[in-house]
UniProtKB/Swiss-Prot annotation:
Its EC number is 2.3.2.6. Keywords: Acyltransferase, Cytoplasm, Transferase. It is an enzyme of class 2 (transferase). It is found in: Cytoplasm. One of its GO terms (biological process) is protein catabolic process. Functions in the N-end rule pathway of protein degradation where it conjugates Leu, Phe and, less efficiently, Met from aminoacyl-tRNAs to the N-termini of proteins containing an N-terminal arginine or lysine. Its main location: cytoplasm. One of its GO terms (molecular function) is leucyl-tRNA--protein transferase activity. It comes from the Bacteria. It holds the Pfam family Leu_Phe_trans. This is Leucyl/phenylalanyl-tRNA--protein transferase. It comes from Syntrophus aciditrophicus (strain SB). NCBIfam families: aat.
Amino acid sequence: MPICPLGKVIVFPPVSLAMEDGLLAVGGDLSPYRLLEAYRQGIFPWYSPGEPILWWAPQPRFVLFPDEILLSRSMRQILRKKHFQVTLDRNFDAVIHACATIGRPAQEGTWITEEMQEAYSILHELGYAHSVEVWRDRGLIGGLYGVSLGGCFFGESMFSRESNASKAALIFLSSLLKILRFTLIDCQVYTSHLALLGARFIPRETFTALIRKSLRRPTLRGNWSTHPETADKLPGHEF
């Protein structure tokens, strides 16, 4: 099956036409409208510097259900000691820049180009992209970012400058999304780091069906640290 080239019109082929490795389409742009339409269909961009924009819809899909997150005994002990302070949407640009320069566990190099950073910063300004920051002594030591639509959070990347900082970010996010009754966190592709925290594969058809169902609820747009639907539901800020 040939890879579908994208033009100026914001339309994607059915995800069922993706190649065996999940590659679905090539080209287009990273405008907010195209990115949001991609996420609504279970598609995400992922490409290396110097490559055209590549769009993916893997089969199966790696996801984390907020009520299925796993905490090891050692991680529980770390969280009880309150080594970290965690915030939401306080410094999105710093988080995505750190993800671009540090990368996430089990990921070789980085794929977050300057073009990608600019595109997701615009989504953040529009209230769709969000960050979780993990601090120690006012220093940013970990975090993650992604896109929220309906009842789904589409995770993009995470980073750690200290052990367990990115885990703390994901645990914090999962706790919040469980309170908000979100359906799932999209982890896109397998990593052992996320598998240890409870992420698992589901069929692509199940994934897209869950997205469609979750989109029936309103999207929580805006800064989540002050949004009326999230600010009063935040779990403890100190881990």
